[in-house]
Design a protein with these regions (language model features):
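Short strand->helix junction
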Residues: 52-54, 81, 102-106
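Allosteric cytosolic regulatory segments
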Residues: 65-72
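Short alpha-helical interdomain "coupling" segment at the junction between an upstream regulatory sensor module
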Residues: 59, 75-89
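Short beta-strand-to-loop transition segments that serve as allosteric relay/switch motifs
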Residues: 38, 44-55, 156
Length: 247
């Protein structure tokens, strides 16, 4: 692709007249510049009908070429950012999966909690940035279990009070792990407080009502719902209806 000025489009065989005929719009002149990334055309900048019935000239073309270069850089940077974000999310999923494999009773738990959390976020009409933050928080909500012994995670019987206290520490441990990563600090409330309860009987800080961050409330509901509707060694899964009523 190369930059192009067409000041008599009606005489150019490449010009499609159908649009003008249907819209009753008169195309007098056109300037087109390819948007390239590493010699690959990824788009086109186009303008038609310069103001005051003037014709496009070489100065206009030079300006458009410069603008196309800036657009190409912006689009390529956006692509690279999306790829980096996706790679990070996949890494987080792999970490969560590795932790999950230590506990034979929670297969697929992280994936379901993430799905439920995003469904709640959609219902609440959260912003895209809030959904991205929530998605990562849901994936990493149990990352602190990396510091819990296998014999406790895999225990089929009800936990002793001491073992339960050990399990409860996974929320704070998860927050401590993530606070060293500056880009993840916004998700820490969802990880640290996803076992808090509206009545203040949760852990680790006994938050109550509006003290709980929204991100933590959403992950808490998703996490609890999944725990209630899946089989555990000490009880059978509840029906979706019963779980919803209890929640």
């Amino acid at each position: 692709g190369r930059p192009l000025i067409v000041n008599t489009p009606e005489k150019d065989p490449r010009f499609y007249k159908g649009v003008d005929e249907r819209t009753e719009f008169k195309t007098r002149d056109i300037i087109c510049v390819p948007v390239k990334v590493k010699d690959r055309v990824i788009g086109v900048l186009e303008a038609i009908n310069k103001k005051h019935r003037e014709k496009f000239d070489r100065e206009d073309l030079s300006l458009f070429v410069s603008l196309a270069d800036q657009v190409a850089i912006a689009l390529d940077n956006a692509r690279l950012y999306e790829e980096l974000e996706e790679m990070f999310f996949q890494t987080a999923e792999s970490l969560a999966d590795a932790i999950e494999k230590r506990d034979p009773y929670t297969g697929g738990h992280t994936q379901r909690v993430t799905s439920y959390s995003l469904a709640i976020a959609h219902h609440l009409q959260l912003k895209s940035s809030e959904k991205r933050c929530l998605k990562i928080a849901a994936v990493l909500h149990d990352v602190g279990k990396i510091g819990v012994e296998d014999q406790i995670l895999r225990k089929p019987e009800p936990l002793s009070p001491e073992e339960y206290n050990t399990i409860k520490r996974h929320t704070s441990m998860g927050a401590e792990i993530l606070e060293h990563i500056r880009q993840l600090r916004d998700i820490i409330p969802g990880v640290k407080y996803h076992h808090e309860q509206m009545n203040g009987r949760g852990y680790p800080d006994g938050l109550k009502g509006e003290e709980m961050p929204v991100i933590a409330k959403i992950v808490a509901v998703a996490d609890t719902y999944d725990a209630m509707t899946t089989d555990r060694p000490y009880r059978k899964a509840l029906s979706k209806k019963v779980a919803m009523e209890e929640l």
